[in-house]
């Protein structure tokens, strides 16, 4: 009984250290129009990121992920929470506003897939018609 209670308390306490990071999907923000705010998040394994649909017409889709992480795609205009189970760099975008460079970066622990993520960022930047350099700026924060 004591062992079971100890394990239950230990498991409950582990979740207490996980943080939730909120990223707003906005028509206008500090970094311009059609933007995720913040555009760069530094998180730990077991944290979550909640994408808040602050304005209609936005959703989030993965573009680069650490090995073993499943692709994700949220629904239009709905909040979406992503559990960060693996270290690495997560690059995501808003599909209808991809050409406006509405994309962002999450770093979880060590950037084990940085080269792969950088290649995706370079491709997204090359295709952007507006706000060029914004995603590159977020990626430069990955250390």
What kind of feature is each model-predicted range?
Residues 1-4:
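Positively charged n-region of N-terminal signal peptides that target proteins for export
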Residues 7-8:
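Sec-dependent N-terminal signal peptides
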Residues 13-15:
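N-terminal signal peptide c-region/cleavage motif recognized by signal peptidases
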Residues 17-143:
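Extracytoplasmic copper-binding redox domains, predominantly the cupredoxin/blue-copper superfamily
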């Amino acid at each position: 009984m004591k062992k079971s209670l100890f394990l239950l308390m230990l498991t409950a306490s582990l979740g207490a250290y996980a943080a939730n990071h909120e990223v707003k999907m906005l028509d206008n923000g500090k970094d311009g129009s059609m933007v995720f705010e913040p555009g760069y998040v530094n998180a730990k394994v077991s944290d979550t990121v909640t994408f808040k649909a602050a304005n209609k017409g936005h959703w989030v889709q993965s573009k680069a992920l650490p090995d073993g992480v499943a692709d994700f795609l949220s629904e239009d205009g709905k909040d979406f929470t992503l559990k960060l189970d693996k270290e690495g760099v997560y690059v995501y975008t808003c599909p209808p506003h991809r050409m406006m460079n509405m994309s962002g970066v999450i770093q979880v622990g060590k950037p084990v897939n940085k080269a792969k993520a950088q290649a995706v960022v370079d491709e997204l930047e090359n295709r952007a018609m507006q706000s060029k350099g914004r995603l590159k700026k977020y990626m430069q924060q990955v250390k």
